[in-house]
Curated annotation (Swiss-Prot):
The lineage of its organism: Viruses, Varidnaviria, Bamfordvirae, Nucleocytoviricota, Megaviricetes. One of the minor capsid proteins that constitute a network internal to the major capsid proteins and outside the lipid membrane. The minor capsid proteins glue and stabilize the capsomers. Stabilized by 2 intramolecular disulfide bonds. This is Minor capsid protein P9. Disulfide bonds join 104-131, 194-201. The gene is A407L. The keyword Transmembrane applies. It comes from Paramecium bursaria Chlorella virus 1 (PBCV-1). GO terms for cellular component: membrane; viral capsid; virion membrane. Pfam families: P9_TM. Interacts with the major capsid protein. Its main location: virion. The chain crosses the membrane at residues 34-55, 60-80. The keyword Chloroplast does not apply.
Length: 210
């Protein structure tokens, strides 16, 4: 399955057009780069301040929003300047790898961690891999299914006494492992190597969509 490679957005004061490219991204997430988080916060402040200014009929709220944006941007600029790397390969820019959405085997009461059990394979030999635990909704569903009918200690707020260490999603959750993907993970893809093309070593931020 092909993947889509997306370069990270510059911060808004370097390219103002990025604010309008993704108007719906207003909540910073861990999958975003630092500049993309700043852009998301700027959009959120803009929307809120101008909405309140229109409702209250008071332009001072818009000015307050612009002041907050200026403070956030200044803090980002000063922080970026302090943490500037002295890496010799300073021309290499990280990029985000956005994985294509695909079907997955969801958690169930009989198989909370979506493992390739004998029963699961008998039901569907061509079952897709288990859904990613990085998905907050899926992680919550797995925990609920695992804890269903389980005698729990009410004082165990960190969930350390219910055998979570022994039960987890296995690396391979299909009938057969994907040896091609594993080989590419170990030795790289069939494309150029770092020696042939330095851009092949560009650091990446992996973003999971499903």
């Amino acid at each position: 399955m092909k993947t889509e490679t997306l370069y990270q957005d510059p911060v808004w004061f370097q390219d103002l057009s990025v604010i309008f490219k993704r108007p719906s991204e207003i909540i910073p997430t861990r999958d975003q780069s630092d500049s993309e988080r700043i852009n998301a916060m700027v959009r959120l402040v803009l929307y809120c301040s101008f909405a309140v200014a229109l409702i209250r009929q008071n332009y001072l709220y818009a000015i307050l929003g612009l002041a907050i944006i200026a403070i956030i941007s200044l803090a980002y600029a000063l922080g970026a300047k302090k943490t500037k790397s002295n890496e010799a390969y300073g021309n290499i820019r990280p990029y985000s790898v956005k994985r294509s959405k695909k079907s997955c085997s969801k958690s169930s009461a009989n198989n909370p961690f979506s493992n390739a059990t004998v029963g699961a394979l008998l039901d569907n030999e061509a079952r897709p891999p288990a859904c990613s635990y990085d998905d907050n909704d899926m992680a919550s569903t797995m925990r609920k299914n695992f804890n269903k009918g389980l005698f729990r200690n009410l004082d165990d707020v960190y969930e350390v006494e219910n055998s979570q260490r022994q039960f987890y999603t296995m690396p391979v959750t299909t009938a057969a492992p994907d040896l091609t993907a594993f080989g590419q993970f170990l030795y790289g893809s069939k494309g150029k190597t770092c020696k042939e093309d330095p851009s092949a070593c560009t650091p990446a931020f992996a973003t999971r969509d499903g």
